[in-house]
Every structure is written in C-alpha cells, then in structure tokens.
C-alpha cells in the first residue's frame, strides 16, 4: 500500500509550492526546508519505483478533493527513477553546507541516498558505468565530510543513536531528540481523519 508514501509526497509538494513565497531571516533557512522537501520526495519515489515500478508522478500538491487530477495514471518506472535523480540533485544544490542534522536531511544524508540510488540504477536498471561513478562520487563526499567520524568506543554506537558515525536516523526513544518521530517522513494512519479512511480517494487509475 503506497498511501502513506503519497501522503508524504503531497506534504512535500505543498512545502515546495508555498515555501518560496515565505520571508525568512536567511536564505539558508529557506533552502534547508526546500532541500528537506526534495529529499523526502526523492526518498518516497525511490521506494515506490523499486516496489511498484510504474507509478503516478505527482509534483503538485492536493489541497481539495475538488481538484483536477485526483485519479492520476501510472507513469513508466523509468520516469519515476528519473524524478528521483532530479529531486536528489535539487536537494544537494539547495542544502547549505553548514547543516549537520542527523534526524533530518543534510548533505551527507542526501549523498548516501544518491549513492544508493545510483548503485540501484547501475545494478538493476542497467544505467552503465556513469551511474557507478556517480555512486562513488557521492560516497567519497560523505567519507570526506568532517561531520562524521568513527566512534573511539564501540559501545557509543549503540548508546547514542545520533552519534558521530550516524549519517541519518529516525529518533524513536523518548527525549533522545525532542519531537523526533518517523511521522516526519511517513504519516501513521492514526493521523488520518476517519472521513478519509471511510471514503478514500483512489490514487491510481488501476484501482
């Protein structure tokens, strides 16, 4: 069921739609939010492409059940993966180098997604040596990032799940990181209204 993934994609689309018109104290703060939205959308479409292949590509947010396009058709898997690559590149371009978050997107997290993506493209989608080179470039960028280092004490890897070796993590433990929960990326069903559950809007034309 890809409902949660598309709910998250819709949230990212709305962020990308409205954030550019909001006044921020700094351009970096705005770009960080936009980069996170691109990263999350890439993350979701990457899963969708690998699990379902052909799938709808939605880039405009839905705000009403009266909008056009509520029953999108599936696009070829190749187009889905192309969208993933574009979103990853946009996220990397916008993400300020100073960001070192481990429970949100950062250049390190985006590069690891990029590496995973290009390895998949090389091995499964037969994208050729260029994809392998792109994966290697992304990995090297993370290895050369001073925000990450090996823990001196092996136990610290498990004691602090947002420690020096961690590039990206979801925080589950209470007070480990205030407000941290996986709903930032996948919306749990308990947060969906009863009306939506009882009368869901179909996502794909194949349903």
List each language-model region with its residue ranges.
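An aromatic- and glycine-enriched ligand-binding surface/loop that stacks and positions planar moieties
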Residues: 1, 81, 88-92, 104-207
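Conserved, well-structured interaction surfaces
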Residues: 1-52, 75-82, 88-102
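Second-shell loop/turn segments in exported
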Residues: 2, 67-75, 126-127
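Short strand->helix junction
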Residues: 23, 66, 98, 124-125
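Short, hydrophobic secondary-structure boundary micro-motifs
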Residues: 25, 57-61, 150-153
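Short coil/turn linking the two alpha-helices of tandem helical-hairpin repeats
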Residues: 49-56, 99-100, 120-129
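Short linear capping/connector segments at secondary-structure termini
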Residues: 60-68
